[in-house]
């Protein structure tokens, strides 16, 4: 798969998602019921971050037991993380930032991928390696929608998934931007609800959010 076709593939995955929940799973036992709760609420595209000791096993379990979930791996920082994501059978990968080494490794891999950027220079580096679908991170902290619009001036064809500081109150505002494919965030799976195994609450929250955001 060429870099262009991989970028088109991840663009379509992200566009179909509307919202990509960023999952930091602390307990392996939570992985499958959490994924099932999200899918039941209409949220199928999931980013499992490599931030915990159980992340790899959690992603494996979701891929094996929740076939309706489209599982990607987030917090990919280097070629070793990338190899883990590919070995798991992830459908896509996401990074919070990007080094030249990581971009080269991804370009040589078969994994659809969105590197993280926060500045024009970082975006130019991503584009130089063939990546025009990117994660804008941390979105609010890096200047918010004003910063995104400023980047869209010289880079009108870049497609973006903003993540960081996005929640129920501002998701629709971000999604209204013409270069935004979807938004990422953790508000659909609050840590307190996960700890309490409040799967029904998570499903209800997802269903409400998807109805509201897709209507907009």
Regions found by a protein language model. Give the residues of each.
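Conserved N-terminal beta1-alpha1 strand-loop-helix module at the mouth
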Residues: 1-91, 108, 157, 168-169, ...
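Short acidic active-site motifs
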Residues: 9, 58, 80-81, 101-102, ...
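Hydrophobic faces of well-ordered beta-strands that scaffold small-molecule active sites
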Residues: 19-23, 46-48, 71-74, 93-94, ...
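Catalytic cores of alpha/beta
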Residues: 34, 78-88, 121-129, 166-182
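Glycine-rich phosphate-binding active-site loops on the catalytic face of alpha/beta enzymes
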Residues: 92-102, 135-145, 178-201
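Histidine/lysine/aspartate-rich catalytic loop segments that bind and position anionic ligands
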Residues: 96-133, 137-142
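Ligand-binding grooves and catalytic loops that recognize ribose/phosphate and carbohydrate rings
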Residues: 121-122, 129-132, 180, 201-206, ...
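Shared catalytic-loop signature of beta/alpha-barrel
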Residues: 125, 141, 146-167
């Amino acid at each position: 798969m060429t870099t262009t076709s991989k970028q088109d593939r991840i663009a379509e995955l992200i566009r179909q998602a509307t919202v990509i929940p960023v999952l930091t799973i602390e307990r392996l036992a939570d992985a499958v019921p959490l994924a099932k709760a999200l899918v039941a609420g209409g949220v199928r595209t999931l980013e499992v971050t490599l931030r915990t000791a159980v992340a790899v096993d959690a992603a494996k379990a979701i891929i094996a037991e929740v076939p309706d979930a489209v599982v990607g791996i987030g917090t990919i920082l280097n070629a070793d993380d990338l190899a883990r994501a590919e070995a798991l059978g992830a459908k896509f990968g996401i990074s919070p930032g990007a080094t030249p080494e990581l971009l080269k490794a991804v370009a040589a891999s078969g994994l659809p991928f969105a590197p993280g950027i926060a500045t024009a220079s970082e975006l130019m580096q991503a584009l130089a390696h063939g990546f025009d679908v990117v994660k804008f991170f941390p979105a609010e902290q890096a200047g918010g929608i004003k910063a995104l619009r400023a980047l869209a001036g010289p880079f009108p064809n870049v497609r973006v998934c903003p993540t960081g500081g996005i929640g129920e109150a501002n998701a629709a505002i971000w999604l209204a931007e013409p270069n935004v494919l979807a938004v990422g965030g953790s508000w659909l799976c609050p840590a307190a609800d996960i700890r309490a195994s409040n799967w029904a609450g998570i499903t209800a929250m997802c269903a409400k959010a998807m109805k509201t955001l897709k209507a907009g």
